[in-house]
Amino acid sequence: MIRAFFGRVLLALAVLFAAVPAAAHQQKLAISTVSINPRTDRVEIVHQVPLHDAEHALRHGGVHSPDIVSSPESREAFADYVTTRFPVRIGDQFAKLTFVGSEVKGGSLWVYQEMPVPEPSQTVSINSQILTEVWARQENRVNLGGGTAVRTLIFRVGDGFKEAGLRR
């Protein structure tokens, strides 16, 4: 009886530890930075998404074998996906974000976008829903500004637009 008990405990531990590496690849966190570049007078938007999460999102969207590290097509597909999941509004109009590029650095895919700086009187609102349709516990952080004046907005599944308050 004791042997059977320890056998079950060992089996349960083996199953638990086997699941940990699979879960470790899913970080469920995307970080975006939105700041004004005074040299170019453009709003720069940078998204950092863990590679495994980005590839999982592409598989979820129907891409059979995504390979973000070595496939420009996979990187472009994820960049297209990001543009649909990160809308920006200026007043009541959707802003046109320009895709600048993407690259793999470390364990993340970085996607770069930009747009013109809105007038100071205009309200800028953001809604980051990157990966929220893939994982219910996804959290997206949007850092606004730069230097020592950074403000962070946190988005989860189902959240609406939040005012960004960009400052020159």
Q: What do the PLM-derived regions correspond to, one by one?
A:
Residues 24-168:
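N-terminal soluble domains immediately following signal/targeting peptides that reside
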